[in-house]
């Protein structure tokens, strides 16, 4: 079991460890699992970069930073998070001096290319607008958080529709400005969404 855990952690394409964690809980009822290996799995399952071990290799550090990023992104779905906030949460400010913007963008792009994050980079405001992020561990607490976020989103949409029906000038102006915005404003710089769609069709050429 220890080998299976290590292989999953070191697999560059694996970012969700909940099923493996649950499997380990069942296996432990009949045979012990090395506590250090199990603790490492728990960190990759629901921990963040603050839990990293100094004994790990660089690849494990990078993966845990990506997982930390999507945790942060999940708290900002439908809104934006600053590069500065990402820099601190991923502890990138503790790395040797380099261009912080480049470093933050590197992790964002890695998350997007691995299809665990969908969003837009605004180069002008140095922010990431989050559309979607992978859920790492779904328990009752996380489900309650998601319900709360969904309720807030529905409330915001209802308020916008109410203002539109009322013909609120400020909303009309915002929509007019939005229609004039283009990629030159930095809004549509870097958009990745490779998730499969139910209506996707393969064509043989």
UniProtKB/Swiss-Prot annotation:
Keyword Phosphoprotein belongs to the record: yes
Where in the sequence is Phosphoserine found? 183
One Gene Ontology term of the biological-process aspect is: protein deneddylation
Q: Which InterPro entries does the protein's record reference?
A: COPS7/eIF3m, PCI_dom
According to the entry, every stretch annotated as the PCI domain falls at 1-135
Q: Which UniProt keywords apply?
A: Phosphoprotein, Signalosome
Q: Which GO terms describe its cellular component?
A: COP9 signalosome; cytosol; nucleus
How does this polypeptide assemble, per the annotation? Answer: Component of the COP9 signalosome (CSN) complex.
Role: Component of the COP9 signalosome (CSN) complex that acts as an regulator of the ubiquitin (Ubl) conjugation pathway by mediating the deneddylation of the cullin subunit of SCF-type E3 ubiquitin-protein ligase complexes.
Q: Which family does it belong to?
A: Belongs to the CSN7/EIF3M family. CSN7 subfamily.
Q: What is this protein called?
A: COP9 signalosome complex subunit 7
Q: Which organism is it from?
A: Schizosaccharomyces pombe (strain 972 / ATCC 24843) (Fission yeast)
């Amino acid at each position: 079991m220890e080998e299976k855990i290590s292989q999953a952690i070191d697999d560059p394409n694996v970012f969700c460890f909940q099923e493996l964690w649950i499997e380990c809980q069942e296996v432990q009822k009949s045979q012990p699992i090395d506590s250090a290996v199990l603790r490492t799995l728990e960190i990759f399952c629901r921990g963040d970069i603050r839990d990293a071990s100094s004994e790990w290799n660089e690849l494990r550090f990078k993966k845990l930073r990506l997982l930390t990023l999507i945790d942060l992104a999940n708290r900002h779905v439908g809104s934006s998070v600053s590069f500065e906030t990402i820099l601190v949460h991923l502890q990138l400010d503790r790395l040797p001096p380099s261009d912080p913007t480049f470093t933050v963008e590197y992790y964002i792009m890695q998350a997007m290319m691995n299809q665990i994050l969908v969003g837009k980079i605004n180069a002008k405001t140095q922010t990431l607008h989050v559309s979607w992020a992978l859920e790492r561990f779904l328990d009752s607490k996380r489900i309650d958080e998601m319900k709360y976020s969904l309720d807030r989103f529905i409330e915001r949409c209802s308020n916008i529709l109410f203002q539109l029906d009322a013909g609120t000038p400020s909303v009309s102006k915002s929509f007019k400005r939005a229609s004039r915005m283009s990629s030159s404003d930095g809004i549509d710089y870097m958009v990745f969404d490779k998730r499969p769609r139910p209506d996707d069709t393969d064509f043989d050429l």
